[in-house]
């Protein structure tokens, strides 16, 4: 049969999805299944690894069945995944020794403090590009080895394997034949030296983690093994892996220095490609690994906005100012500006570049003339201002000129927000026709690895832009608006 399709497995924090793409990068079929979130203690978050596998394997089968596609028509399968989430299982049986500890889980805070006390904070920053934080996998591994009976002894005997979610899925899809990850996922473990592109022995020793547990690191655009769907049909190559944010960066074809993307979700995730330079940030951004045009390792700066779409949820659920998130564009467009109102949504503190956990949300500039429309508009503008804060930090750190800003995520449907983002950053904002850029990135990597597509140049003809948002305000107005935002931020921190 002719190979007509590539499938992306998109394993997220709350659901597993499979998306089928054709040769023109159009979505042919989507299947999704949510799975259980486990909260055994305050600040702890877990998933059942077997439920992750069951949900992911079922949507793979379902996505093909829905479109009437035979598995022999599939050229390759790519994987993208929630990063940092940690799974340890028995090599002989494939049985997890503990639930997956999710990236959000804070249980290993004390281990991080111990490493700081040992003077490892700067070493971690320099060699992994990360902060010493429970967010990342390394301290989660140590917690499991320290707290699950016999786990450390088994690990030292070579009986246990570690993997992030990509590695777990690859292991299951190949029936235990392949124990592999890619550099984008390895770079989120706190154990991977992003300069030598190898596991860091100093950090493995500090955390007492046996190297034999760790997966082999292979390129993101590579064939790792094969699988059969439901045990039927021919063997399908498993051929591309990238963590979710790096997959989105590649799906947006941000493969050259100075190219950046912003994913607008509950928060916002911004990544800027810095090419072959691993730039150490002086603004609290993370240095991470990305994928280049030939599938080679590139580097990127990464930063996140805590409150993006969550700010709009607050307008809806706590204030009752809107019924649906889509209402915000209508109300914001009813007024010419915010009438001097600024909302700083520091509900859980401020992230990069401020890193102030004690800041709290506030509305500034309220007068008797301020109304609901002004507050709603200020909420939308706050998302763009926070994104500009990060983009400005990336530009200063990297020395790169921002060429354009590619965007994806739910909020990109809001034309007002996208136009204001272009206005306040003074760069063109590009919204793609296919907004499933995370899955598209995994599909692109898989397709390139098997020759389904030949080059990034070919992909540029597939990844169409739905709308260009060009800056539409002058420099003096831009400066006045942003100075007002910066003043408001200062006051939330005082």
From Swiss-Prot:
| Catalytic activity field | glycerol + ATP = sn-glycerol 3-phosphate + ADP + H(+)
Entry's Gene Ontology BP terms: glycerol catabolic process; glycerol metabolic process; glycerol-3-phosphate metabolic process
> What is one GO cellular-component annotation here?
cytosol
User: EC number(s) per UniProt?
Assistant: 2.7.1.30
Residues at which ATP binds: 13-15, 266, 309, 313, 410
List S-S links within the chain. Answer: none
Query: InterPro entries given for it?
Result: ATPase_NBD (IPR043129), Carb_kinase_FGGY (IPR000577), Carb_kinase_FGGY_CS (IPR018483), FGGY_C (IPR018485), FGGY_N (IPR018484), Glycerol_kin (IPR005999)
Q: How is its activity regulated?
A: Inhibited by fructose 1,6-bisphosphate (FBP).
Pfam families, per database record? FGGY_C (PF02782), FGGY_N (PF00370)
Instruction: Give me the residues that bind glycerol, please.
Output: 83-84, 135, 244-245
For this chain, one GO molecular function annotation is: glycerol kinase activity
The family line of this record is:
Belongs to the FGGY kinase family.
This one is known as Glycerol kinase
Species source reads Shewanella sp. (strain MR-4)
Read off the lineage from the record: Bacteria, Pseudomonadati, Pseudomonadota, Gammaproteobacteria, Alteromonadales
Which gene does this sequence derive from? glpK
